A protein has these predicted regions:
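Conserved glycine-rich cofactor-binding loop
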Residues: 6-8
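C-terminal helical subdomain
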Residues: 176-180, 184, 196-243
Length: 251
């Protein structure tokens, strides 16, 4: 199961795992985009099967109802990729919009918890499973204007550690993937559709691609059963930390 499957890292991960022959439950808020992705994957990877679930991870009842509605043959989820997440705004704490804060907290923390709570009882019963949480360099450092987003990703890191402790007796692995700068719709969402400002985030250096992170997720999933790649930090070569990027002007 991949949350936030319709764009960016989620979409790229769906392609990489389908290529490997996995059967995928694709989830997201946008039904049309989910169905288009499903159809595209089915044409490209005919040996894999695909199911879509439309829900907003922020709505606990919707999450629970959607996962409970899975047909019997799709109930045994062996891998959960908690990819849904976002940043909104880059204002100082005294200027930030509380609605933006709530959107980030509800998606990045509560949404991850709702989906995990709905899926993990089955893993526990089967005494097997793998959870992959999408963290961020922002879960290790804090940068100006990013206080709330960074706090949510610090929470994801703490939750990942707690999940490992709670699920350890059941043979369930928990991997945290922490990207640096990845060129996706992330900055367009953060800057509320300001494409020029979003593009400037990735100007004059080569950022990571969604496919880079998808392949990192594959790497974690394909480790031997006795190996848990618990915490992976993935950065562009041009990025040293959350605030230090070496930009080489063109020309």
């Amino acid at each position: 199961m991949i949350t936030g499957a319709t764009a960016g890292i989620g979409r790229a991960t769906a392609h990489v795992l389908a290529q490997d022959g996995h059967h995928l439950i694709l989830t997201g808020r946008r039904r049309e985009r989910l169905e288009a992705l499903r159809d595209e994957l089915a044409r490209t990877y005919p040996k894999s099967r695909f199911l879509t679930l439309t829900f907003d991870v922020r709505r606990r009842e919707s999450v629970e109802e959607a996962i409970a509605s899975l047909p019997d043959e799709w109930q045994a989820i062996d891998t959960l990729i908690n990819n849904a997440g976002l940043a909104v705004g880059l204002e100082s704490i005294h200027e930030g919009d509380p609605d933006d804060w709530e959107r980030m907290i509800d998606t990045n923390i509560k949404g991850l918890l709702y989906v995990t709570r709905a899926v993990t009882p089955g893993m526990v019963a089967r005494r097997a499973g793998h959870i992959v949480n999408l963290g961020s360099i922002a879960g290790r450092e804090v940068y100006p204007g990013g206080a709330v987003y960074c706090a949510t990703k610090h929470a994801v890191r703490a939750l990942s550690q707690g999940m490992r402790q709670d699920l350890l007796p059941y043979g369930i692995r928990v991997s945290l993937i922490c990207p640096g700068a990845v060129e996706t719709e992330f900055s367009i969402v953060r800057f509320k559709g300001d494409n020029q400002r979003a593009a400037s985030v990735y100007d004059s250096y080569t950022p990571l691609s969604a496919d880079d992170i998808a392949r990192t997720i594959r790497f974690a999933l394909t480790a031997p059963a006795h190996v848990d790649l618990q915490d992976i930090l993935v950065m562009p070569t041009a990025q040293a930390d959350a605030r230090t990027i070496h930009r080489t002007p063109k020309g």
